[in-house]
């Protein structure tokens, strides 16, 4: 079953504070968080996606190849926005692999030049362009292809864009488990809730003594820089459902 965009918090062992805070922010524009949900339901009935909030603007971030990128680079395009940790052993590799499949579907649909995948590195203090490039390559993407921009910056820049701008929480958690157990830090936060465990060769090789816990969300940003959909289980979003939503933003049938 394909996942639909939702404002409901997923029962995931991840931080949900940013999206909860987002409901309060949106209350100013829609009257309340209930109003936002009602708008989503009305929109679904009308087969359109509501405007949720403006995506943040930024400049002088760096992509996986070390090139400077600003938010203006995506003007006039639909963006599929993700938040990824290069050494992740849970959701991020699954999300990346799914987005590669989605990009291939875009290409076969003739829409590749109208849509960009934009992801943000939620470990800006510990990893940089080299690790980001290796991560994309590990999960099937040609890192030189400009249709996927994996962005990083200083910790302050990324915190401003990701948490203040997109309302997505993340935090660094030091590993209190045994050496080499890169999932134990996340489990310390998650408790007994199950998480998918994915073998990430980059994480195995680096063996860093920490994890980054973050919200498992995917967002759609329209050609005018407005967030139009939030999927709160990014690793479960089907590529055909995502393509349908993208087509609606592009004014295409199908």
List the predicted regions and their residue ranges.
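Thiol-/selenol-based redox modules, centered on thioredoxin-like
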Residues: 175-254
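Extracytoplasmic
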Residues: 54-56, 74-78, 112-117, 127, ...
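Short extracytoplasmic
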Residues: 46-84
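Short active-site neighborhood of thiol/selenol oxidoreductases, capturing the structured segment around
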Residues: 69-99, 117-118
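N-terminal targeting signals for export/organelle localization
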Residues: 1-58, 62, 253-254
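Structural microenvironment flanking redox-active thiols in thiol-disulfide oxidoreductases
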Residues: 96-161
């Amino acid at each position: 079953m394909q996942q639909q965009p939702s404002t409901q918090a997923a029962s995931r062992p991840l931080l949900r504070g940013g999206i909860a805070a987002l409901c309060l922010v949106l209350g100013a524009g829609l009257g309340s968080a209930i109003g936002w949900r009602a708008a989503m339901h009305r929109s679904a009935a009308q087969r359109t996606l509501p405007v949720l909030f403006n995506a943040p603007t930024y400049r002088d971030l760096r992509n996986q190849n070390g090139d400077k990128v600003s938010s203006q680079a995506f003007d006039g395009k639909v963006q599929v926005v993700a938040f990824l940790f290069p050494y992740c052993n849970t959701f991020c590799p699954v999300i990346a692999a799914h987005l590669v499949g989605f990009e291939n579907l875009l290409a076969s649909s003739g829409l590749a030049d109208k849509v960009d995948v934009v992801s943000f590195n939620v470990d800006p203090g510990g990893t940089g362009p080299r690790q980001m490039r290796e991560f994309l390559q590990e999960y099937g993407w040609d890192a030189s292809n400009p249709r996927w921009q994996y962005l990083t910056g200083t910790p302050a820049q990324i915190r401003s864009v990701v948490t203040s701008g997109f309302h997505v929480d993340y935090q660094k958690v030091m590993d209190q488990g045994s050496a080499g157990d890169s999932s134990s830090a996340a489990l310390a936060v998650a408790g007994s809730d199950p998480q998918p465990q994915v073998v990430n060769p980059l994480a195995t090789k680096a063996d860093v003594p920490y994890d980054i816990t973050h919200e498992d969300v995917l967002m759609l940003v329209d050609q005018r820089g407005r967030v139009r959909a939030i999927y709160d289980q990014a690793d479960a979003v089907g590529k055909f459902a995502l393509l349908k939503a993208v087509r609606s933003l592009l004014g295409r049938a199908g």
